[in-house]
Amino acid sequence: MSNRKPYVREMTRTWWKDDPFYRFYMVREATILPLIFFTICLTFGLGCLVKGPEAWAGWLSFMSNPIVVVLNILALLGSLFHAQTFFSMMPQVMPITIKGKKLDKTIIVLAQWAAVAAISLFVLVLV
């Protein structure tokens, strides 16, 4: 075994703030936090729906709290931001080739947003 001390580069807790690429990545990954709150609220809402009308009314009054509404709006914005970054990466990760020609990136991204809009409209009409 060697007596040499190996070089260990110092890593601060805020290392990601220095590089715009990593800062963007961390912001993108942080969008999960409001989504976790939204998912927990929906789970409790399903539980209240099963428990009966009084529990359901209590959950509805909780969901109408302005702080909860703001958190749900943040969750929606975070979800849309996450989807936009995911959709813009998709053509680079998995390029689609039709008859030997690569499909334009904007067509792929717009097709994904069209699918989101169609599914959202279908669910809106269904409910």
Curated annotation (Swiss-Prot):
Gene3D superfamilies xrefs: Fumarate reductase/succinate dehydrogenase, transmembrane subunit (1.20.1300.10)
Cellular compartments annotated: Cell inner membrane
UniProt record similarity statement: Belongs to the FrdC family.
Main localization (coarse): membrane
Membrane topology qualifier: Multi-pass membrane protein
Functional description taken from the UniProt entry: Anchors the catalytic components of the fumarate reductase complex to the cell membrane, binds quinones.
Annotated GO MF terms: succinate dehydrogenase activity
Gene giving rise to this polypeptide: frdC
Paired cysteines (S-S): none
Known partners and oligomeric status: Part of an enzyme complex containing four subunits: a flavoprotein (FrdA), an iron-sulfur protein (FrdB), and two hydrophobic anchor proteins (FrdC and FrdD).
Pfam family, one: Fumarate_red_C
Name of this protein: Fumarate reductase subunit C
Keywords in alphabetical order: Cell inner membrane, Cell membrane, Membrane, Transmembrane, Transmembrane helix
Domain of life: Bacteria
Ranges that cross the membrane: 30-50, 67-87, 107-127
One CC-aspect GO term: plasma membrane
